[in-house]
Regions:
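Bacterial N-terminal signal peptides
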Residues: 8-17
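Bacterial Sec-dependent N-terminal signal peptides
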Residues: 17-41, 284-293
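Solvent-exposed N-terminal domain segments of exported/luminal and surface proteins
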Residues: 28-120
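Short, solvent-exposed loop/linker segments at the N-terminal edge
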Residues: 59-60, 169-177
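Recognizes extended acidic, P/S/T-rich segments that occur
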Residues: 81-116, 198-241
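Extracellular fibronectin type III
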Residues: 142-143, 255-290
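Conserved aromatic anchor
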Residues: 173-193
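Beta-strand-rich modules
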Residues: 238-260
């Protein structure tokens, strides 16, 4: 995530905008209008339980994350993006634009916040109704309420590295060989009864200078994204540089609710992300990070 929000969703329920939205808002799809994904691939809100995995495989709790995000399609445009909090009354916060330097994922409008405990997270981001409002490049106003419900987080994944069909230490990654990243089965994962999107798995790797030099893909942006059925993700030989330190995460995301809003998907999850640092073997590549100041 850094704070790593990418598609870690919380429980999301889409309600009709009437009766809970700001005045003079346009409800998408009320008269059969189809907007589609030319500007926005999807949007939603989430809560994520985050842990750091140590070299011995143990996990350290590093707190929780709330986020609200609008994922912008390539060449798309979003303006006037905000989210109305359930309390205090009239608490409307702007979503900020964030450009992605990665070739793997696109830009977002976002808001995020951290907490040490679930109770603190719920105090700062109550499990109640939030209202997304934004304007697409085509001039359509999306105005939809989302509501958090009381559900459990996914079980925290454990990250396992394998090369040449052998489990390896996280400081012994050979960059000239395919790296197989795996994890225990995502047993809580399930197919989506609505047929919109099944529960998801994400894998991402950051270098010291660029986030997401590797990303398993977000739905609607990459065809071969991972669902709960996936057992591994392969980083091809030559992707990583020798003699470098990288950071990564594996996330298991339960999509508790899925909807299609005038052709724009909206989801939510309670997700579990495990972060880990690892090193590649070999002499330091001159194109790598080198000694940091």
């Amino acid at each position: 995530m850094q704070i790593r929000a990418y598609l870690a969703w919380a429980i999301l329920v889409i309600f009709p905008a009437a009766g809970c939205s700001p005045d003079n808002a346009t409800e998408p799809g009320v008269s059969g209008e189809y907007i589609g994904q030319d500007d926005v691939t999807f949007f939603g809100a989430g809560k994520v339980a985050r842990y750091q995995q140590q070299s011995d495989g143990s996990l350290e709790n590093i707190g929780l994350l709330f986020f609200a995000e609008i994922f912008i399609a390539a060449g798309g445009e979003v303006t006037d993006a905000s989210i109305q909090f359930p309390q205090p009354a009239g608490d409307i916060r702007d979503l900020l634009y964030r450009h992605s330097e990665s070739d793997e994922i696109g830009d977002v409008m976002y808001l995020s916040g951290n907490a040490d405990t679930v109770d603190e997270l719920d105090r700062n981001f109550p499990p109640a109704e939030y209202v997304f409002k934004f304007t697409t490049g085509s001039g359509n106003i999306i105005n939809q309420a989302v509501s958090f419900n009381d559900r459990k987080f996914a079980k925290q994944p454990i990250i396992i590295f394998r090369q040449n069909e052998q489990t390896i230490a996280t400081d012994q990654v050979d960059p000239t060989v395919d790296l197989v990243i795996t994890w225990p089965p995502f047993t809580e994962g399930r197919a989506d009864a609505n047929g919109v999107l099944d529960d998801l798995i994400f894998v991402a790797i950051d270098s010291c200078t660029v986030e997401d030099i590797v990303h398993s893909g977000r739905p609607f942006e990459k065809d071969d994204y991972l669902t709960f059925r996936a057992k591994e993700y392969v980083v091809s030989a030559g992707t990583l540089l020798p003699g470098q330190e990288y950071s990564m995460y594996v996330e298991h995301a339960i999509l508790a609710d899925t909807h299609d809003v005038a052709g724009i998907p909206a989801f939510a999850t309670l997700a579990a992300s495990t972060y880990m640092d690892f090193k590649t073997t070999g002499a330091e590549d001159p194109n790598g990070c080198g000694e940091q100041p």
